């Protein structure tokens, strides 16, 4: 439990500090570049299909310092997966939790809240066809969570083989948004595979952490109207209209009309955006949208690609419409049963930014309450405690005190 709480503390610290990056890269030049000090420890490709050559791109940053007298070579490794579906983890790397934050001038600033301060940090462009990852054909892009997890498992095994010190290091899976499906599916797959493999081929999974995740879409899509109403963002008439659209979405889910359900959810979110006039549903307090187009500009530079081990002709797209289209029918399918499996077999952390109207606190707690897990009554009765970092309010934590804890964290500042 102690190791999970240390991980949790780092997550919350990032919520406060990620926006306070200090400039340390060279001034803007005519073309962006990757300063040597900002380069990943390792980056390149992990082949998932030796026949076709399809591969997952990775960028690994070794821990900056040791923690609690643990050598860096033994520190835990966090594997970050972005959402989408079809969005590159280089967004998380360069705009959220990586050691360097990309600014609008296409230069890099040191991130004092980076998650690799005391952990190794791996960013994977998942699934194939996303970001810098390679899919030799659209037909090879996975269409369900099982096949996505299978590719990721192969990639992780190959990553571990890159350095003999990686083999015994604890591994945690983390990410946000649509990774609320990737992470449970991958954790489930790893545990199942580990039970069938010899010790030397197992993945040393120690826990999972899901941020603002889409995990049980049927329940989560039903929370938007009432949540927005009680925040004062919409009135009763608008609430009734939104609830009607939500029930329409649920109807498609229950009839197994998955494509229609995804389209219906998109209508719910579009309607909510239009009703509120918000810049983004990911954080209702923001006055302008997230400025992430800078990631495409930076990563499509030839010198940057060369530095990362990417071919010059590989076009980077931060969110792939092709991958999103392939997984369109998968979006509204629940993986809650996989989380129910995980809480019995490893550590689970759910963390949410308080300002997220899509998959934030009410959305997450709504599906957590319906989990088939003997720990739920204890969890729901547990005290909700104030979380402080350096004496300042960081959020609130609720956990069930058992051998396999399930924690819910609310970030007072947005985690996204």
Q: What does each model-identified segment do?
A:
Residues 1-416:
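Terminal and linker regions of secretory-pathway proteins
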């Amino acid at each position: 439990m102690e190791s999970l709480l240390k991980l949790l503390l780092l997550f919350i610290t990032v919520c406060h500090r990620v926006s306070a990056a200090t400039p340390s890269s060279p001034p803007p030049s005519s073309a962006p570049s990757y300063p040597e000090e900002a380069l990943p420890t390792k980056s390149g490709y992990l082949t998932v299909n030796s026949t076709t050559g399809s591969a997952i791109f990775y960028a690994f940053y070794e821990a900056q310092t040791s923690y609690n007298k643990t050598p860096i070579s033994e520190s835990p490794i966090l594997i970050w997966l972005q959402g989408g579906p079809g969005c590159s983890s280089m967004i998380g790397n360069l705009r959220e939790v990586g050691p360097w934050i990309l600014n609008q001038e296409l230069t890099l600033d040191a991130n004092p809240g980076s998650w690799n301060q005391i952990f190794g940090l791996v960013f994977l462009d998942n699934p194939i066809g996303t970001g810098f990852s390679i899919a030799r054909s659209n037909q090879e892009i996975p269409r369900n969570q099982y096949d996505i997890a299978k590719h990721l498992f192969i990639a992780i095994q190959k990553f571990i083989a890159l350095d003999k010190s990686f083999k015994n290091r604890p591994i945690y899976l983390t990410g946000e948004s649509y990774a609320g499906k990737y992470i449970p599916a991958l954790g489930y797959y790893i545990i199942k595979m580990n039970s069938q493999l010899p010790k030397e081929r197992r993945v040393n999974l120690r826990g999972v952490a899901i941020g603002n995740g889409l995990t049980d879409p049927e329940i989560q899509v039903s929370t938007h109207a009432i949540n927005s109403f009680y925040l004062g963002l919409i009135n009763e008439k608008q609430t009734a209209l939104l609830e009607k659209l939500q029930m329409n979405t649920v109807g498609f889910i229950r009839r197994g009309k998955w494509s229609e359900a995804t389209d219906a959810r998109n209508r719910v979110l579009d309607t909510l955006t239009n009703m509120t006039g918000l810049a983004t549903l990911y954080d209702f307090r923001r006055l302008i949208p997230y400025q992430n187009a800078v990631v495409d500009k930076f990563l499509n530079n030839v010198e940057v690609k060369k530095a990362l081990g990417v071919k010059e002709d590989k076009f980077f797209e931060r969110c792939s419409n092709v991958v999103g289209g392939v997984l369109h029918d998968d979006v509204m399918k629940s993986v809650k049963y996989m989380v129910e499996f995980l809480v019995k077999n490893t550590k689970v952390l759910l963390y949410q930014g308080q300002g997220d109207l899509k998959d934030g606190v009410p959305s997450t707690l709504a599906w957590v309450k319906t989990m088939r897990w003997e720990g739920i009554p204890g969890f729901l009765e547990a005290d909700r405690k104030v979380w402080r970092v350096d004496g300042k309010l960081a959020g609130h934590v609720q956990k069930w005190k058992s051998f396999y804890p399930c924690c819910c964290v609310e970030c007072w500042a947005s985690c996204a």
